Amino acid sequence: MLIRPARAEEAGALAALAVRSKGHWPYSAAFLKRFERTLALTPEVVASNDVLVAERDSVVSGFYVLLHRDGLAVLDDLWLEPAEIGRGCGRKLFEHAAARAAARGARVLEWEAEPYAVGFYERMGGETVGWVDSPLGRRLPVMRLGLEGPEGGTTTP
């Protein structure tokens, strides 16, 4: 599996992948349509942020968006093609995002989790530290992971 920077012209395909990924869970078609309208994955966003894709056999199988803010990295998106769920792609993308965040000086990785994916994120070492209201009217868990500090020790969220 290759992980590489996304290209701006892939924004539409990545947004469609996110909708397919969300559709893996038991959401209604109406909810998925509302979700699609909230996506802000434009060519400009891809070009100006840390957006990386995973490819298997030259086909995009997932992606993540990583934002950087004063020692904190925010995993803004992590989505997989439904066929990739449970095949290790999510783990590889998450580990890549955490390592990339640490390499850029972040001490903590934080994200708002898809509720159906909380178990995955807990297996990755994430802990729920709060809750936030989503634009879609749901409560989402806010999760954090301490990253390797400059002395090699893990920081706590």
Where are these regions (language model features)?
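A short beta-loop-alpha structural element at the N-terminal edge
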Residues: 2-16
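Conserved beta-strand in the GNAT
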Residues: 53, 59-67, 74-79
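Conserved acetyl-CoA pyrophosphate-binding loop and the N-cap/start of the following alpha-helix
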Residues: 84, 88-96
